[in-house]
Regions:
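Short carbohydrate-recognition loop motifs
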Residues: 1-12
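Extended, low-complexity, turn-rich repeat/linker tracts enriched in Gly/Pro/Ser/Thr and Asp/Glu
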Residues: 26-29, 38-47, 57-59, 112-114
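Cysteine-clustered segments with highest specificity for TGF-beta superfamily mature ligands
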Residues: 84-112
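Proprotein-processing/basic-patch segments
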Residues: 107-137
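Short beta-strands within extracellular/lumenal beta-sheet-rich domains
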Residues: 10-31
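Extracellular ligand-binding interfaces
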Residues: 43-71
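Short coil-to-beta strand junction motifs in C2/discoidin
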Residues: 32, 43-50, 118-122
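Extracellular carbohydrate recognition and processing domains
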Residues: 60-95
């Protein structure tokens, strides 16, 4: 069946990773925003996602410290299995460079703020960014 999701359990912090190539027309001097698309069978409660990220170029050590962006609790809308979108997670300006790979780790943070029962099903992550103008001579 379609769509396919990654399910995050309610009993322990669980992760999913994605890697995004930072192409030349992205303006890396501007912050980017990430949004998590998800649903849940639960009709009440709050879910909390965190995002960790690091950006690396070819030849750089990928085993370095990541930046953690803690999420805020998002309240379910009261209807089961409805596609929801998280609030924005900021990826800092100058955190990436053109030609880098942005490594993202999305985690359901089952802390005290996350009290939604059952799985949170993640369908994807949207990255919003600013482009640089192209000048051709």
């Amino acid at each position: 069946t379609i769509p396919t999701a990654i399910s995050f359990d309610t009993s322990a912090d669980e992760n999913a990773c994605a890697n995004v190539y930072i192409h030349d027309d992205i303006d890396c001097s501007e912050a980017m925003s990430a949004y998590i698309y998800y649903s849940a069978a639960a009709t009440s409660g709050d879910v909390t996602f965190d995002i960790d990220y690091v950006s690396k170029a070819s030849g750089e050590d990928v085993g370095t410290t990541v930046t953690d962006v803690a999420g805020t609790a998002t309240t379910t809308n009261g209807t089961a299995d409805v596609l929801e979108i998280s609030s924005a997670y900021s990826i800092a300006a100058d955190a990436c460079a053109n030609g880098d790979v942005l490594f993202l780790n999305v985690r359901r943070d089952v802390s005290a703020a996350d009290d939604m029962s059952g799985d949170a099903d993640m369908y994807g992550v949207r990255i919003d960014y600013t482009t640089r103008p192209s000048v051709k001579e």
